[in-house]
């Protein structure tokens, strides 16, 4: 319980500009138009307490996949009540050897809190300096907006962490999938990554890319 309180305290700190300063809330209406500031607002007369609650973070994600990890997001519009409030969160489950590969959130900074296990986490600055830290239960680390970062289970058992973001829709781009899980011609991938034809085709084969 103390750990959960810490997580939500962090969430309350990472948002400095809130839609709620204009009106009480703007529950996401997924059927309406979306703008850079978020989803359009649901009719207040149709808003219920269920819009402000999310129950999906208590269940472990399925880590039976190539990265041996799972992310359970609580973003808008799935978590409708956080729309426009400048916060969101997610659950990270990592089996032994599991990894959240190098990725970036273009729309928000991220704070991670380790609940179980040991996680090696780090990010790379725009000057290509690496900031790397081994985190244990109760430890936290912040990842600045837009910078490449990762989380790796470096312990002997499963690892669990919760992350909070300074946006209700932080966005996500995972570098290996962006490079090799698409239909960009292999010769262009080779030219822009300095990898060989065999290496590119191997990675595309593993991650589902074509061409």
From Swiss-Prot:
Any one GO molecular-function label of the UniProt entry: manganese ion binding
Coiled-coil regions listed in the entry: none
Segment forming the signal sequence: 1-20
Residue positions binding Mn(2+): 103, 105, 110, 149
SS bonds (residue pairs): 26-41
Keyword Phosphoprotein: yes
UniProt name for this protein: Germin-like protein subfamily 3 member 3
């Amino acid at each position: 319980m103390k750990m959960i309180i810490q997580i939500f305290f962090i969430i309350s700190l990472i948002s400095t500009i809130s839609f709620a300063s204009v009106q009480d809330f703007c529950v996401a209406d997924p059927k309406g138009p979306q703008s850079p500031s978020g989803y359009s607002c649901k009719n207040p007369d149709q808003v219920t307490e269920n819009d402000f609650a999310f129950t999906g973070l208590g269940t472990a994600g399925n880590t039976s996949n190539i990265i041996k990890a799972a992310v359970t997001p609580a973003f808008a519009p799935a978590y409708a009540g956080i729309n426009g409030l400048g916060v969101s969160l997610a659950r990270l489950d990592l089996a032994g050897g599991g990894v959240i590969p190098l990725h970036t959130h273009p729309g928000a900074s991220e704070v991670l809190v380790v609940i179980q296990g040991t996680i090696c986490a780090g990010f790379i600055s725009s000057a290509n300096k690496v900031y790397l830290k081994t985190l244990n239960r109760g430890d936290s680390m912040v990842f600045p907006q837009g910078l490449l970062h990762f989380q790796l289970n470096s312990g002997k058992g499963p690892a669990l962490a919760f992350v909070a973001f300074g946006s209700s829709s932080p966005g996500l781009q995972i570098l290996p999938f962006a490079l090799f899980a698409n239909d960009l011609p292999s010769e262009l991938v080779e030219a822009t990554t300095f990898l060989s034809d065999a290496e590119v085709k191997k990675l595309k084969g593993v991650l589902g890319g074509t061409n």
